Amino acid sequence: MRSIEKAVTGNKVSAIDGGERRGPISMDHIASVADRADALAHEIRARVMAPDVRKLAPNFTVAQAVRLSGLGDEPAGASWAAAHGHQRRAISVAEARSAASRNRPAYQRPSSRGAITIAVANFKGGVGKTTTAMTLAQGLSLRGHKVLAIDLDPQGSLTTLFGIVAQTEVTEGMTALPLLRGECDDLLPAARPTYWDGVDLVTAAPMLFAAEFAIPSRQTQADGTNFWRLLDYGLASARDTYDVIVIDTPPALSYLTINALMAANGIVVPTPPTALDFASLAHFWQLFADFRGNAEFLRGGGKQYAFIHVLLTRVDQSDVAMPAVRGWINAAYGEFVLPAEIPKSTVAPAMAAAFGTAYDIGAYDGARATYRRIIDAYAEVTTCVEHSMVAAWKALQQKRDAETKFPLASGHADACTAR
């Protein structure tokens, strides 16, 4: 935090001066403000990440590695922990992933199945959507899964969390834009390795906003293009390469969001338990449900999901209204609501200011209980989602077995359903 304070020293704009401005504001003036803000953002990022500039993954203690990789719940994992417990050395992300993959075979993707695609979505901003996508990617990778993270938000917040400056380091070929424009039919070449072992990234930048114009224009072409299936079709190779695909979506019902929802096997909807967020979430589901009224969406039997999870985020136990709103959410969404919750914590904003998450902390400088509370919450969410992934793979296998045994009764399954 001190590095951030130093970064803005001498660059503050007087609030009094700003308040005294009179007269019209030209586009040139807006452009100069944008340039100033962009320069300051670059300076802050450079200071926070100096001297390496690039983010580095943390190292964990043996106890942390066991807890975050799910090894503590497996007999073989417990043996691994016992074998390493006497060693007072750091465990890398790669080592934790390798141990999880070897010692948790029941949770790994069957070779005959494709990746589970998860869209993290909410039409309202500020609900913890990007942080949820990032921590899911990190948490699932620590469980031994190979993860592809896709940033579909032109703001590029997920890209920034991976330590990449969207405005200057991202090219079109690193985004989903060429796919959505029809310049290619495979998103896999856009994926790039990241600082976090086991997680690759398809980045985003403001240029991705052009997709909001390109997608509907493709629908007017006479080639039978379905605008809501562009991303789904482009993920075929990625589904054979990765175990799970996590998509961060824009906070709006945009063409990009629709493509993410139509490509997904499962959806995670983060929401704080406040009255305003509850009302906004109701609109989300209503608009989402309106898809069923579109005859074109229903071709092939309709879209189906393996799981949908509503995740309570930024849960403030000191908020007297919170229990009531939590009750509303449980009453409205029932089995969709995850038992795990993300508490409001001083850790999350501190890490966000440093362009990171709770998983990026190897050693926490503050109260140990504070860190344990937030990291254990994210780990519990990861466990819930992983169980849903495993169940989806098993259900799909049973469905395929039934279709093989009774081919005449199987019908024609929608290509968008869980793979």
PLM feature spans:
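P-loop NTP-binding core
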Residues: 1-63, 74-79, 83-419
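The alpha-helix within a helix-turn-helix
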Residues: 66
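Core residues of bacterial helix-turn-helix
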Residues: 69-70
